[in-house]
Curated annotation (Swiss-Prot):
The HgaI modification system consists of two cytosine methylase genes responsible for modification of different strands in the target DNA. The gene is hgaIAM. It comes from Avibacterium volantium. Pfam families: DNA_methylase. The lineage of its organism: Bacteria, Pseudomonadati, Pseudomonadota, Gammaproteobacteria, Pasteurellales. This is Type II methyltransferase M1.HgaI. CDD domains: Cyt_C5_DNA_methylase.
């Protein structure tokens, strides 16, 4: 009978990524998150986990997390250091800018924790550019891969990969850099790829709802949009952008055409995984976040709205009965979903620890 591994979660947010860890045999004992509203939600979802709220750069916070982890013999660490400094949606798109962005140095506190705690298994995840990140170490620009190899190469096997959540059971295209460290003498292989799950398979059985309407299902209601936005999207076919419409085209109040990218005001497709869900999934003008819709008898399309919270949950791989309080602000839920690594990806990666050892 396998023995459960005790775990630590750094930069946990509300803990979406770790949601299924208990199913594979990893029990998160302690977590750390800076932003209070995310940490408070984490504590409500995981009432038995110890949440340390505060900045990990604060030595008192760092030591508190470390001491709890040591006391509980933590042997697994998962860390998702903030990615805004590396995100392609951000401004820092070249190595030199990233090296001067203080947010990108938060990974050094993960490294410091590993050196103190020495867990058997470590999973660090972030946007794909993480693997190209270079930081100033002793006044020298050094790739993150070299930093980790120099610090831990003698004790750990270190693996660098870019994985797409859609290849591991999540109905969403979401590529993440995955760094795995496992102590020498242990094995940690990648999981086998799985069958692709489409948007239709994930949310196709949910009732159709229009903007401002409620289905009666928890978290499945149509977010409110302007009459003009609804009109544009009603005339936009599945998989298309309103910017491709000949008549019902996004316009300003004075009638002038809005300038924008074809990824905006765009319906997603039914027959493939959803595009990457972004933090602005509440805005119908944002990237590829409008319901696919279905053709109606009058020639328009249904569901002229952004995806509902329930649809976002399913497309992230979360269950309908995800334990979030009823009074959780919708925008907070949308933000943490837009930032998270899908939990089925983490589950599949970590299950290999137990399959091999």
């Amino acid at each position: 009978m396998k023995k459960n591994i005790m775990g630590l979660s750094l930069f946990s947010s509300a803990g979406i990524g770790e949601y299924f860890l208990s199913r594979v045999g990893i029990d998160i004992i302690v977590a750390n998150e800076l932003i209070k509203k995310r940490a408070d939600l984490y504590q409500k979802i995981y009432p038995n986990h110890k949440m340390v709220i505060g900045d990990i750069r604060d030595q008192r916070i760092f030591n508190k997390v470390l001491n709890i982890a040591l006391t509980n013999q933590v042997d697994f660490l998962i860390a998702s250091p903030p990615c805004q400094g590396m995100s392609v949606a951000g401004k820092n798109r070249d190595v030199s800018n990233m090296a001067n962005d203080n947010r990108n140095y938060l990974i050094m506190y993960v490294i410091a924790m590993i050196k103190k705690l020495k867990p058997a298994y470590i999973l660090i995840e972030n946007v794909p550019f993480l693997l190209k990140l270079e930081l100033y170490i002793d006044n020298k620009l050094t790739p993150i891969k070299n930093i980790l190899e120099d610090e831990f190469g003698s004790e750990y096997h270190i693996h660098f990969d870019i994985l797409d959540a859609a290849d591991y059971g999540t109905p969403q295209r979401r590529k993440r850099a995955i760094i795995r460290l496992n102590k020498k003498g242990t094995i940690w292989n990648l999981p086998l790829k799985q069958n692709i799950v489409s948007v239709e398979q994930a949310i196709g059985n949910l009732p159709s709802i229009e903007s401002g309407k409620h289905s009666g299902l928890k978290w499945h209601y149509g977010r409110g949009h302007t009459e003009q936005q609804i009109e544009w999207m009603k005339h936009t076919p599945t998989g298309k952008s309103a910017f491709e419409n000949l008549v019902h085209y996004p316009r300003k109040a004075n009638g002038e055409k809005v300038k924008g990218y074809h990824s905006s005001y765009r319906r997603i497709r039914w027959d493939e995984p959803a595009p990457t869900i972004t933090i602005r999934n509440d805005a119908i003008s944002s990237q590829r976040n409008v319901h696919p819709g279905r053709p109606l008898l009058d020639g328009t399309y249904s569901d002229a709205r952004v995806l509902s919270v329930l649809e976002l949950m399913r497309l992230t791989g979360l269950p309908d009965n995800w334990e979030i309080p009823d009074d959780t602000p919708e925008i907070l839920i949308r933000q943490i979903i837009g930032e998270c690594i899908p939990p089925l990806l983490i589950e599949n990666i970590t299950r290999e620890i137990f399959n091999e050892n």
